[in-house]
């Protein structure tokens, strides 16, 4: 990674990682509400859905604010990368970035979408369908803006590449993002409801049973689109060890393998005993390992975005 400030610098990688984490978290919020909770068939379903619906907008608002701040940080970072650290922000330099380049159009899309997310999030507590549709559209537009300034935008068929990368992000959000929302929001909400420890364990078990099949579908989408993008980018297996891009991709795949293996462990070993009162601690440990591995894969992705491919 470059020690000088540029698209490969640590600061730029950190900004992209934050943007990716916000994207995955926001998509995961939609998956939690519209997929996982819709499948929930455990005890106190209406009460649990109501509690999550009350708390979820705060998470969406927080993620939207961080995404908006990171989007502006990306503008400053891009300015330094293009014009150098000695060049101060000016009307001409900002106009060049924001109005005379494809990068600028993508930035406007991301900034507008993030702003709409933060604007609509507090209004989601009213539980209106229109508000949630606006939030979903803004989140999807924000997600779509991410690959528009990376390798997919420079592909031979950029529209297909961007669409595939968007599906890849949706897969990540539906799996990892909804797991994060499940762990940080839905399970604590299940514990906070009135009832004894057995009822709490039953609610948590119901949530995980609702989540597990959807995680399989979304992780399959992540894997299929990732395989397609890998082949499209590299054109074979040899570049996996012959190029910096390929070696970084292998590291990312290693982290994803750990996350997938931990998810399989949760499904096969933890899920069958979740009705027991003390199984929650076991689930919490394994879920944190899965999320940690996924976070490292996300950071690897932030590095990949600015890494030249084998044919560049």
Predicted regions and their residues:
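Polytopic transmembrane helical bundles with strong interfacial aromatic enrichment
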Residues: 1-312
């Amino acid at each position: 990674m470059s020690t000088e400030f540029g698209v490969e610098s640590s600061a730029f990688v950190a900004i992209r990682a934050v943007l990716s984490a916000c994207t995955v978290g926001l998509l995961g919020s939609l998956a939690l509400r519209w997929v996982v909770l819709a499948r929930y068939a455990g005890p106190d379903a209406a009460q649990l859905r109501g509690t999550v619906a009350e708390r979820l907008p705060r998470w969406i608002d927080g993620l939207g604010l961080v995404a908006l701040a990171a989007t502006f940080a990306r503008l400053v970072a891009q300015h330094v990368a293009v014009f150098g650290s000695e060049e101060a922000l000016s009307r001409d330099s900002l106009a060049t970035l924001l109005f005379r380049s494809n990068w600028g159009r993508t930035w406007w899309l991301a900034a507008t979408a993030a702003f709409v997310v933060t604007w609509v999030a507090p209004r989601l507590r009213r539980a209106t369908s229109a508000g949630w549709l606006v939030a979903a559209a803004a989140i999807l537009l924000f997600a779509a803006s991410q690959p528009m300034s990376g390798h997919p935008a420079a592909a031979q068929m950029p529209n297909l590449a961007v669409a595939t990368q968007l599906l890849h992000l949706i897969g990540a959000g539906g799996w990892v993002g909804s797991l994060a929302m499940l762990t940080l929001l839905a399970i604590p909400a299940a514990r906070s409801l009135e009832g004894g420890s057995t009822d709490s364990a039953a609610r948590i078990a119901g949530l995980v049973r609702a989540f597990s099949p959807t995680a399989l579908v979304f992780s399959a989408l992540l894997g299929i689109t990732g395989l397609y993008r890998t082949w499209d980018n590299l054109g074979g297996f040899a570049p996996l060890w012959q190029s910096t891009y390929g070696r970084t991709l292998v590291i990312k795949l290693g982290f994803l393998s750990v996350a997938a293996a931990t998810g399989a462990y949760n499904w096969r070993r933890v899920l069958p005993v979740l009705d027991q009162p003390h199984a929650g601690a076991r689930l919490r440990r394994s879920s944190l390992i899965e999320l940690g591995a996924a976070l490292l894969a996300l950071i690897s992705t932030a590095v990949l975005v600015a890494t030249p491919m084998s044919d560049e």
